[in-house]
Amino acid sequence: MKQSIVHIALVVRDYDEAIEFYTKKLNFTLIEDTYQAEQDKRWVVVAPPGSIGTTLLLARASKAEQKPFVGNQSGGRVFLFLNTDDFWRDYNEMVAKGIMFVREPKKEIYGTVAVFEDLYGNLWDLLELNDDHPISRRAL
């Protein structure tokens, strides 16, 4: 049996501001932006450049009970992990584009990592795993 996680839903305040952030600040590719009239919503999917794995489904908070979770889907913990093949290239580009890093780069036993916030305050790891890390054989 072969299975995979296709999308991770990220609750956002507004489709267009989220698309702008992810495509302009993080260089993600807009995979799909389809209006679904029967549900009066959009199906918006983005992914890191060159990625063939899991994508982000940008899901607008449309109900009152969803709105408090914009920017806090993981209770203040790091929510998503953006793996890169060149940490310093991506870190420097992100800083130049105004991405807010809340934890500075650090060399750990598993690789190089820094924590940044997206436009809503969700925490992300930017990381480059060591070549011998078990995930590095699967990632990228």
Question: What function would you assign to each model-found segment?
Answer:
Residues 49-54, 62-65, 87-88:
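Short, charged/polar surface micro-motifs in flexible loops or helix N-caps
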Residues 48, 60, 128:
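Pocket-edge structural micro-motifs
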